[in-house]
Design a protein with these regions (language model features):
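Cytoplasmic-entry segments and transmembrane alpha-helices of multi-pass inner-membrane transporters
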Residues: 11-47, 70-74, 85
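Short helix-capping/hinge motifs at transmembrane helix termini and TM-loop junctions
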Residues: 16-21, 49-51, 63, 131-133, ...
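Transmembrane alpha-helices
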Residues: 58, 62, 94-128, 151-155, ...
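Hydrophobic alpha-helical transmembrane segments of polytopic membrane proteins
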Residues: 137-175
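Transmembrane alpha-helix signature in integral membrane proteins
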Residues: 1-15
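Short cytosolic juxtamembrane segments of multi-pass membrane proteins
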Residues: 176-187
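Short cytoplasmic-facing helical segments at TM-TM junctions of multi-pass membrane proteins
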Residues: 71-114, 137, 141
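Hydrophobic/aromatic residues within the transmembrane alpha-helices of Major Facilitator Superfamily
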Residues: 2, 36, 49, 61-65, ...
Length: 187
């Protein structure tokens, strides 16, 4: 689900950035949708997909894609205009401009947006699992609640936090460190 949300978020973010009409009319809608808690998508997903994996997938995508789209648009906007002007002055095409100037310049902020999108996707997955009948940490949490087993509830919450820390340290921190090292920004 997260991979689909990333692709969708990048596409929407690029479209919003590239077309002023979308920037003016679609971005406010996306900002509004982004503020919805993921659990709000659960009733729609159950009505459309039933109590299925597709329902959870839908909640994960809706919970994170719009956050990623906004971060892509903002990351590109925050690239210093002088970089683009210099590249265009030297004869860069639009493709070369994005490939060699804009994307590398916005990469650190983009990674931060991916990290935020992942945290939204992770929360959405938990809310989807809590509301549907799938097997996973969310359902294990609900089972603990139903059995009034505080130890199970606490353990599941600790596992959820540990998975979040592991993803941050094992994926995003490694990616950020590589980018910073490649740019000579680390000791």
């Amino acid at each position: 689900g997260y991979a689909i949300a990333v692709l969708l978020g990048i596409l929407i973010g690029l479209l919003i950035h590239h077309f002023p009409y979308l920037q003016k009319n679609l971005k406010p809608v996306i900002l509004g949708i982004q503020t919805l808690p993921s659990v709000c998508w659960v009733p729609f997903s159950i009505l459309w997909f039933g109590l299925s994996t597709q329902a959870i997938l839908f909640v994960v995508i809706m919970g994170s894609a719009f956050s990623i789209a906004i971060s892509v648009d903002n990351a590109i906007k925050n690239v210093q205009p002088i970089y683009s002007k210099a590249a265009l002055t030297m004869g860069a095409s639009q493709r070369q401009l994005y490939q060699h100037v804009i994307f590398p310049a916005c990469l650190p902020e983009f990674i931060t947006g991916l990290k935020q999108g992942w945290s939204f996707a992770w929360r959405a997955l938990m809310s989807g699992e809590v509301m549907t009948t799938s097997i996973g940490l969310g359902q294990t949490l609900i089972t603990g609640r139903d059995l009034a087993d505080i130890n199970q509830v606490t353990l599941v919450m600790i596992v959820i936090v540990l998975v979040g820390i592991a993803i941050d340290k094992g994926v995003f921190s490694v990616l950020e460190a590589r980018i910073l090292k490649k740019r000579g920004l680390t000791a």
